[in-house]
């Protein structure tokens, strides 16, 4: 269970890093928002899911 928790935390950190870098780049590009809206929403949905997964796994660890 600890390995699953560590992988979930790593995935959350990696997704957070990608969103922090990627979303401003998408919004700054000339046609960024209209062409990459689905990718931004998918990344945000993945991030929210990972937050809940880490919280659930944390309740089993501690």
Swiss-Prot record:
Keywords: Chloroplast, Membrane, Photosynthesis, Photosystem II, Plastid, Reaction center, Thylakoid, Transmembrane, Transmembrane helix
GO biological processes: photosynthesis; photosystem II stabilization
Keyword Plastid included in the entry's annotation: yes
Transmembrane stretches, start-end: 8-28, 41-61
Cellular compartments per GO CC: chloroplast thylakoid membrane; photosystem II reaction center
Keyword Thylakoid: yes
Location of the protein in the cell: Plastid, Chloroplast thylakoid membrane
Cystine bridges: none
Family: Belongs to the PsbZ family.
Subunit structure: PSII is composed of 1 copy each of membrane proteins PsbA, PsbB, PsbC, PsbD, PsbE, PsbF, PsbH, PsbI, PsbJ, PsbK, PsbL, PsbM, PsbT, PsbY, PsbZ, Psb30/Ycf12, at least 3 peripheral proteins of the oxygen-evolving complex and a large number of cofactors. It forms dimeric complexes.
NCBIfam families given in the database record: PS_II_psbZ
Gene: psbZ
Highest taxon of source: Eukaryota
Protein name, as recorded: Photosystem II reaction center protein Z
Free-text function comment from the UniProt entry: May control the interaction of photosystem II (PSII) cores with the light-harvesting antenna, regulates electron flow through the 2 photosystem reaction centers. PSII is a light-driven water plastoquinone oxidoreductase, using light energy to abstract electrons from H(2)O, generating a proton gradient subsequently used for ATP formation.
UniProt membrane topology term: Multi-pass membrane protein
């Amino acid at each position: 269970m600890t390995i699953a928790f560590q992988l979930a935390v790593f995935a959350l950190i990696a997704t957070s890093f990608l969103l922090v870098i990627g979303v401003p780049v998408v919004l700054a590009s000339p046609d960024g928002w209209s062409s990459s809206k689905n990718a931004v929403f998918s990344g945000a949905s993945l991030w929210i899911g990972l937050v809940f997964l880490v919280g659930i796994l944390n309740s089993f660890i501690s």
